[in-house]
Amino acid sequence: MFKKKMLAASLSVGLIAPLASPIQESRANTNIENIGDGAEVIKRTEDVSSKKWGVTQNVQFDFVKDKKYNKDALIVKMQGFINSRTSFSDVKGRGYELTKRLIWPFQYNIGLTTKDPNVSLINSITLPKTKIETTDVGQTLGYNIGGNFQSAPSIGGNGSFNYSKTISYTQKSYVSEVDKQNSKSVKWGVKANKFVTPDGKKFAHDRYLFVQSPNGPTGSAREYFAPDNQLPPLVQSGFNPSFITTLSHEKGSKLIRVNLKFSYGRNLDITYATLFPRTGIYAERKHNAFVNRNFVVRYKVNWKTHEIKVKGHN
């Protein structure tokens, strides 16, 4: 009965509802880097922020112009910030006076999609491309004249490449993996994994994760859950993504414009904690209570002029 009440109560949650606000956009000047043998990389950067979704997309577009490569290539680095939107609150309603609620990010989502027939993702050139559980993530993409791409961990450094680009981010207590990948899209999930707590290690699906007994029945919602110094950064504040993928385009194609869709966001869990004076604290959990709370931005890319335009967002 208690579980059914908690799940029903979740339907009335308004704390994670986005706040209405326009996006903010900024554009960096074009930078051209000569990489040898007449080849060059034309670099553009777009920043788009949304208070509504608590997300900043910083996307770097690096066009590879190489006469010895039979295709045009675009290296895309997706970085920025995704706010955790973690919150602590009372559960309203008669009988819930001693029940508190924690909303927190079980998973962060980062993705790129295109439906254009003249563009394909190079699946082997995706960072990261395998499951990674380490706290610190750092990998490198290397390019040599003629269309030779390589990526870590198969390479040992940057010195032997005409051009290279790196990713670096921290994911304490989380794990990164590719959820979906094909010639038209790639999606990463940075998911809750293992946590070190004062009571020992706990797995992400443990319903007592982050739950603690308050000092008394009059305690605030915040007192029912672990203090800030016991919460990993991805729960307490948010996540700074850093991911790379590469797209190819047929040289000479009359279709010089392509639509790309970038998605940054989170899936949120709800943890309920109820204090029973005689028996102590009791926890309930709703996994994926709110999924795909994503900020989606649509870009138009011109392969000929290397112009990037923001066409819209959700």
UniProtKB/Swiss-Prot annotation:
Its main location: secreted. GO terms for molecular function: toxin activity. The gene is lukE. It is found in: Secreted. It comes from Staphylococcus aureus. Keywords: Cytolysis, Secreted, Signal, Toxin, Virulence. InterPro entries: Bi-component_toxin_staph (IPR003963), Leukocidin/Hemolysin_toxin (IPR016183), Leukocidin/porin_MspA_sf (IPR036435). GO terms for cellular component: extracellular region. Induction: Expressed at the late exponential growth. Is cotranscribed with lukD. NCBIfam families: hlyII (TIGR01002). This is Leucotoxin LukE. Toxicity requires sequential binding and synergistic association of a class S and a class F component which form heterooligomeric complexes. LukE (class S) associates with LukD (class F). LukE can also associate with HlgB.
